[in-house]
């Protein structure tokens, strides 16, 4: 799997973005071809698909966690399906307590604390496991652009700072698809931020299905210490912003590629950097779980989703998905 950082030209167009446009056109054509030839299957349960239009972290994992807690509180049986990014997974599997991030993906390990999770790289492989588990609801993390299964309810997650970047498709820009169709057909749109940002103009036509959501800390961290932050997630800038908004003194930071699998040498280098800054290492839950087999003394900041209008979420999901029917 190719792991890339989010390049600057994905946010603001420059000569590199324009030079890559011909490849983006090929990407667009292949996407249209794939969609036109696909014959979507009907999964044996209602499907809630959480996805985004662009590469990089937009808060999908936190949205799935929120949905899982909501359904569990309503005593609704559900299964989460996750894409197993950054793992060596060969076939679809139900995650158990002993699985590692390298085996099933970092997101799968985290989400398994909230319910039954199937990790897969091919959506078609989940059917036997779904038939065995017999859930009422299937929450699918990502796969928004996958045309091979029917979606009953779609949630599009949008990062409030990056939005849709420079507006170009991969690799000239960050977009997996142009946002117009995704936003028009979405049942809900989550505008995710680390602060209470204003609604951007591009989303004002969708105000009736827009939910403002904030990523907020859910664990206590000693605010008297200095911290050196690092992360290998899709949107590290939002993590660093969350740390500062929480009132932590961040003396430095290091960014790794998304879904990065850390080595002992990386850990030693990070400890050296922290010592230079007279600081304690701090990172995300997605990164922290990858140090299970390495001696470490790294602080983990857990985060969760806070939304401004939960009634809209409840009304839309329980009405459209017809959970109790």
UniProtKB/Swiss-Prot annotation:
Q: Which residues bind ATP?
A: 54-61
| Alphabetized GO MF terms | ATP binding; tetraacyldisaccharide 4'-kinase activity
Q: In which pathway does it act?
A: Glycolipid biosynthesis; lipid IV(A) biosynthesis; lipid IV(A) from (3R)-3-hydroxytetradecanoyl-[acyl-carrier-protein] and UDP-N-acetyl-alpha-D-glucosamine: step 6/6
Which E.C. number(s) belong to this protein?
2.7.1.130
Q: Identify the keywords attached in UniProt to this record, alphabetized.
A: ATP-binding, Kinase, Lipid A biosynthesis, Lipid biosynthesis, Lipid metabolism, Nucleotide-binding, Transferase
Spell out the GO cellular component terms annotated for this protein, sorted alphabetically and separated by semicolons.
plasma membrane
Q: Origin, by domain of life?
A: Bacteria
Pfam families, per the entry: LpxK (PF02606)
Among the record's GO biological process terms, what is one?
lipid A biosynthetic process
The record's listing under InterPro entries reads: LpxK (IPR003758), P-loop_NTPase (IPR027417)
Catalytic activity reported? a lipid A disaccharide + ATP = a lipid IVA + ADP + H(+)
Q: What does this protein do?
A: Transfers the gamma-phosphate of ATP to the 4'-position of a tetraacyldisaccharide 1-phosphate intermediate (termed DS-1-P) to form tetraacyldisaccharide 1,4'-bis-phosphate (lipid IVA).
Q: Which family does it belong to?
A: Belongs to the LpxK family.
Under which name does UniProt file this protein? Tetraacyldisaccharide 4'-kinase
Q: Which organism is it from?
A: Rickettsia felis (strain ATCC VR-1525 / URRWXCal2)
